[in-house]
Amino acid sequence: MEHSSWHALIKAQLPEGYFGKINQFMNQVYVQGTVYPPKEKVFQALLTTPLEEVKVVILGQDPYHGPGQAQGLSFSVPDSIPAPPSLQNILKELSDDLGVKKSHDLTAWAEQGVLLLNACLTVPAGQANGHAGQIWEPFTDAVIQVVNHLDRPVVFVLWGAYARKKKALVTNPHHLIIESAHPSPLSVYRGFWGSKPFSKANAFLKETGQEPIDWLR
């Protein structure tokens, strides 16, 4: 993380010594019990999508809390693991919008400039939101602010009430915000179906002279 294009800019947004607190927190929780994702994957979103390549941000809440699911990218799971319900619904909406993506590992999106960021970067096994409010939110808010300060137009995809609160951090008029209900089975019928976020994001990227994302990869 220290050698990534993100490090200095995130650090500048945070109180002095905050990175040290994050390291302390991680050293503590990974010793105390099972935590997801694996420690080496906690910053995977930032390592896979360098700041200079960000075109789209898809904001999640926290990692999946079952064995083998979380890989440090919001909503994504390895292909060896069945897609959780929210991801199934994302891929169904993609299928209705642009076509079928065969893989439910979203790494190919991240490699094309889609920052798959969770607001909370770790979770205790079996406890959704178990690390919420402890350390991560100021850090991931700083990530959003760093992207917000870019001159290059970026698409922010905000699904559900939690993600939509982060709209307050996106103040740059160059950027596009696409928001809808969350893809979880509880809320998918409240406006996620038919929202076409993928084609909308690509239309904006083309309008602003950028390469669209190949969402089917």
From Swiss-Prot:
- Single Gene Ontology BP annotation: base-excision repair, AP site formation via deaminated base removal
Give the keywords, sorted. Cytoplasm, DNA damage, DNA repair, Hydrolase
Active-site residues per Swiss-Prot or TrEMBL entry: 62
- Its main localization is cytoplasm
Where in or outside the cell it occurs: the entry states: Cytoplasm
Q: Per its UniProt record, what Gene3D superfamilies does this chain match? A: Uracil-DNA glycosylase-like domain (3.40.470.10)
EC identifiers of the protein = 3.2.2.27
A Gene Ontology molecular function term of the record = uracil DNA N-glycosylase activity
Going by the entry's taxonomy, the superkingdom of the source organism is recorded as Bacteria
Cellular component terms, GO, for this chain's entry?
cytoplasm
| Broad class of enzyme this protein falls into | hydrolase
**Free-text function comment from the UniProt entry:** Excises uracil residues from the DNA which can arise as a result of misincorporation of dUMP residues by DNA polymerase or due to deamination of cytosine.
Xref: HAMAP family: UDG
Q: Give the record's family classification.
A: Belongs to the uracil-DNA glycosylase (UDG) superfamily. UNG family.
Identification of the protein by name: Uracil-DNA glycosylase
Q: Which gene encodes it?
A: ung
